[in-house]
Amino acid sequence: MSIWVLDNAAGTFTHTEFGPYAGWTARTLTVKKDETANIAWTNVDGRVSVWNYELDSAGYSQITYGAFSGWTAQGITDSADGSACVLWDNVNGSASLWGLDNGTGAYTHHEFGPYAGWTAMAVSAGP
């Protein structure tokens, strides 16, 4: 994966490359007002990792969650405050929505279901 940053004043690009990382796939990238970005990754073993990337310094911190038996991350997005939200789906028909604190690794969650025959598919957060 590569992140390209445009400097409008200078008309130049800088870029940083990541990976490849065996078993990991970059899922989403969200750029926030404070010139940081959240990059969400999923692993084939069920883990989820959220990277907080500093666009001006190419530095980053990351927090990894899971894997959790029976649960699969179905969607990852950023909320209006810049924190990540993860939608998990369970083989029993339950869904869980996590709000992550990117700085501490703490999370809050709400679980729904189980709902027989239904699968959670995507998550989106508004302003």
Locate each region found by the language model.
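Trp/Gly-enriched beta-strand/coil motifs that build multi-repeat beta-propeller-like domains
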Residues: 1-127
